[in-house]
């Protein structure tokens, strides 16, 4: 794993930055270390939804908020709204929650949400269980592909997206093992620590990878 030096991960987490036009309209500043205000809010609510076990009320507005938080060049909100009448959204969310501890089954279920390609399907998993899941977005995908650490993912094939996410999840687990073996502690911030010696969750590793990928973009 020579392309990534985990000793840099604390600095990468501190360098994480995400902001779009929806932050201000929703009353949030940009998501930056150490507060990550919108991320922390989405994460807290997502964990509570998943912890219920049985979904009795469909969190449609919560999904809309995830789409608003992540809105970039490929904003899927119109596809989401247009597809709502064609699926039982509450049944899909129940399936996600039922399988949240099984990465392959969880991402397969999340991909059934209208407009939720791999980026947003994995974001939902990340907010439902940040200890176990991270978001695999286009920036991270491109950087890992260039570093030959993740295969090409074909978004037109569900099987490719599912396999790609499972590979990414395994990579994050290996990175956490390296962080643990080197006793590299996660910097203290507004988000909870994992119940481990170093405190890194997969979502934290993903955020560090996002900043790592941004650095790779600047260097290319």
Predicted regions and their residues:
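C-terminal accessory module of base-excision DNA glycosylases/AP lyases that mediates lesion recognition
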Residues: 1-44, 64, 134-220
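A positional/architectural concept
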Residues: 39-59, 68
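Short, solvent-exposed loop/turn segments at secondary-structure junctions
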Residues: 71, 127, 210
């Amino acid at each position: 794993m020579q392309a990534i030096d985990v000793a840099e991960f604390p600095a990468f987490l501190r360098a994480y930055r995400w902001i779009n036009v929806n932050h201000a309209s929703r009353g949030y500043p940009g998501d930056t270390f150490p507060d990550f205000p919108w991320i922390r809010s989405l994460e807290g609510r997502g964990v509570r939804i998943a912890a219920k076990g049985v979904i009795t009320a469909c969190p449609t507005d919560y999904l809309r908020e995830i789409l608003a938080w992540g809105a970039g060049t490929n904003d899927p909100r119109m596809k989401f709204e247009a597809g709502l009448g064609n699926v039982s959204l509450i049944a899909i969310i129940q399936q996600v929650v039922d399988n949240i501890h099984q990465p392959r089954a969880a991402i397969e279920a999340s991909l059934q949400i209208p407009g939720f390609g791999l980026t947003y399907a994995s974001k939902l998993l990340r907010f439902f269980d940040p200890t176990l899941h991270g978001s695999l977005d286009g920036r991270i995908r491109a950087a890992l592909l260039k570093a030959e650490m993740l295969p090409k993912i074909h978004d037109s094939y569900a099987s490719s997206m599912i396999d790609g996410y499972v590979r990414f999840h395994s990579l994050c687990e290996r990175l956490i093992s390296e962080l643990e073996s080197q006793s590299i502690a996660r910097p203290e911030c507004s988000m909870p620590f994992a119940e481990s010696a170093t405190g890194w969750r997969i979502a934290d590793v993903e955020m560090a990878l996002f900043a790592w990928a941004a650095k790779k973009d600047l260097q290319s």
